[in-house]
Amino acid sequence: ASASASNKTYNGNATASTSLTFSGLVGSETLGQSVTSAFNNKNVGTGKTVTISAITLSDGSNGGLASNYTISAGQTTTANITAKALTVSGITASNKTYDANTNATMVVTSASYSGLLSGDNVVVSATGTFDNKNIGTGKTVTISSSYSGSDVSNYSITNQSSTTANVTALSLIHI
């Protein structure tokens, strides 16, 4: 029998969906199958090894009886695990007093991660730049994000591109 595994999108586990193509069956007999298989790990990659750990044959059609055949587990094949979509939002910028620069202080404590699997570790860090240095309300802040964490490579991340914050006038002190 030859094995064929399906590609999958990252789902946090190594379980694979595998099927067998039988050769050597008598006449037009067919057999049913239940295959247990797994990727070598849960992480994203191409050409990843998939190993079959158990095969259960069942009766098929045209007289194909499972009891007339034997098969052993242990076959391998390859398949791909592609990155899961992850969308980051909820990053904010702090309001500030005019200081003649466009630097923004970013707040990531309320960031949300749509698509992140429970137990996975992905953390955002962000820097921000106001559209100009002048005072204003609801000013656009462009966000530049970077990511870390043990599972970051398993995700295709859509960044939050901007937010808004205020720049207030600097109070002058009279002496």
Which residue stretches match the model-derived regions?
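Short loop/turn motifs that initiate or flank beta-strands
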Residues: A1-I173
